Regions:
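Non-globular, low-confidence helical/coil segments that flank catalytic cores
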Residues: 1-181
């Protein structure tokens, strides 16, 4: 199965995805028809926080919460502050164990209100070294530091592995500063 948000794609792209999924016997599902599913001991919840008719395709990101053994992981995709605001209005969000920081740590995501509500223990930022957008944004990093989130950035930490069975033990293939930013 592949879960997508249909409105995030042009009709030509949707047609191509449909043909490919049929060819390879993969079920293609719109996220608005799924909302959640279980896989073994894990449950996946898709939040309806899409911004209708937005010109910013990032606002069509699928935001997913994974729950496993009393741990909560929130995957933000490239969601914007507008998506975060909608999440805060529509849902009673819990505190999060692990946050995959939205939009590579861009200033268009990770609002103060959102970060203070979910209080992630660990924040993961995926951004390339010396990237042209100078990500992650320093204000986003300071916001996360302000709530004492342990920050791991792929620029310094490389591949990060978190053991969900072992009280969130973190291992990384560090390129530099192993403690995060």
């Amino acid at each position: 199965h592949i879960v997508i948000y249909n409105k995030g794609y042009s009709s030509n792209t949707l047609m191509l995805l449909s043909k490919l999924s049929h060819k390879y016997n993969i079920k293609l599902m719109d996220v608005r028809q799924v909302s959640s599913f279980k896989l073994g001991d894990s449950s996946f919840l898709f939040f309806d926080s899409f911004i209708p008719n937005s010109r910013d395709k990032n606002e069509y990101s699928i935001i997913t919460m994974i729950a496993y053994q009393n741990k909560k992981v929130l995957l933000m995709g490239d969601a914007s502050k507008n998506n975060e605001s909608l999440l805060l209005k529509k849902y009673n969000l819990p505190e999060i164990d692990i946050l995959k920081v939205g939009h590579h740590g861009s200033k268009t995501s990770s609002s103060k209100e959102f970060i203070e509500m979910i209080k992630p223990k660990i924040s993961l930022i995926s951004s390339g070294k010396n990237n042209m957008y100078h990500l992650p944004n320093i204000e986003v990093v300071k916001r996360l530091q302000g709530i004492r989130s342990r920050i791991y950035n792929s620029q310094q930490n490389g591949q990060v592995t978190i053991d969900l069975d072992d009280n969130l033990k973190v291992d990384s293939n560090s390129y530099g500063n192993a403690s995060g930013l």
